[in-house]
């Protein structure tokens, strides 16, 4: 990539007026989205901005946190020390006032709060054979206690073919039907409302060639008010069974074969994390830090 293109990426800022016009033009489509409010926006960013991010995207390795269980096999990182300048700059732009105003206008959800810590978000990467079973997301920010309201996903996969799989599936509230399948195409932005029943994932193993990965940026937004549909109570990720599918038990999740790349202690913690509200996990972490 030329130095001019990289400089452009590192100086990129959202155009407030363009974003607000985009939000106005898509608000009705967003709210009408089924099985829950969502929108797919292609060609969302200048291509040179995402090209710069893609060029510096970290390869799989020890710097990533590996989720490796029958429920999910993926890599994630919120550590900006392994990110390049263009990536860090773009992440900060997604937390900026113009982008927050865009999300509020698009979705009708007021007083959204971004997450500078990128808890659960940041960079995601899935290798061949990886997957993420259908689920509803954790509903409370582990540090602030704010209610989770929105997901925004930016895909970074050039020349992605349908046969590679990896489509984001949106499932009905009763888990009988996948009502939307969204391929993770380069420069595609997906925004959707998160509730206790906004079930989504890509449950089938990824079938891309060796050396390729499914790359994305994941961004989550919060508010002080719970969504009207909230069932009450904090929860972590709520995995769901598709028709004819049986999900593993906690015992199976913590068995040695359930996470061959992690020691037993890490497997146990991962299994407990699935059933423990994130705000409780964070409280325990802080208590341990004070005692250290």
Where are the regions a protein language model picked out?
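Proline-centered turn/helix-capping motifs that create local helix->coil transitions or kinks
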Residues: 61-63, 110-113, 158-162
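Active-site rim elements
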Residues: 39, 85-93, 137-142, 175-179, ...
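Non-heme Fe(II)/2-oxoglutarate
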Residues: 18, 22, 27-107
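Eukaryotic charged/polar low-complexity linker/IDR segments
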Residues: 151-153
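A structural signal for the main folded, soluble domain(s) of proteins
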Residues: 72-77, 106-115, 119, 124-131, ...
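Non-heme Fe(II) oxygenase catalytic core, chiefly the N-lobe of the double-stranded beta-helix
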Residues: 55-58, 82, 91-148
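Catalytic core of Fe(II)/2-oxoglutarate
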Residues: 2, 143-148, 158-292
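N- or domain-start disorder-to-order transition segments that initiate the globular core
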Residues: 1-27
């Amino acid at each position: 990539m030329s130095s001019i293109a990289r400089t452009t990426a590192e100086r990129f800022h959202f155009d407030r007026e363009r974003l607000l016009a985009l939000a106005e033009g898509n608000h009705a489509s967003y709210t009408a989205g089924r099985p829950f409010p969502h929108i797919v926006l292609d060609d969302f960013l200048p291509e040179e901005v995402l090209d710069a991010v893609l060029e510096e995207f970290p390869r799989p390795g020890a710097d990533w946190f590996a989720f490796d269980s029958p429920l999910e096999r993926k890599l994630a990182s919120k550590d900006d020390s392994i990110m390049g300048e263009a990536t860090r700059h773009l992440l900060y732009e997604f937390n900026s006032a113009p982008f927050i105003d865009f999300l509020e206008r698009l979705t009708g959800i007021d007083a959204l709060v971004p997450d500078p810590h990128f808890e659960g978000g940041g960079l995601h990467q899935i290798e061949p054979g990886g997957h993420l079973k259908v689920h509803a997301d954790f509903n409370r920010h582990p540090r602030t206690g704010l209610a989770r309201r929105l997901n925004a996903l930016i895909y970074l996969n050039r020349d992605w073919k349908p046969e590679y799989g990896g489509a984001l599936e949106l499932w009905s509230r009763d888990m009988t039907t996948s009502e939307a399948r969204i391929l993770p195409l380069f420069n595609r932005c997906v925004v959707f409302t998160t509730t206790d029943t906004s079930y989504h994932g890509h449950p089938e193993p990824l079938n891309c060639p060796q050396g390729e990965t499914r790359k994305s940026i994941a961004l989550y937004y919060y508010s002080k008010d719970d969504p009207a549909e909230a069932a009450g109570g904090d929860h972590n990720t709520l995995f769901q069974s598709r028709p004819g599918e049986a999900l593993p038990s906690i015992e199976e999740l913590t068995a040695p074969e359930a996470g061959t790349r992690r020691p037993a202690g890490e497997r146990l913690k991962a299994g407990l994390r699935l059933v423990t509200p994130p705000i409780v996990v964070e409280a325990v972490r802080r208590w341990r830090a004070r005692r250290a």
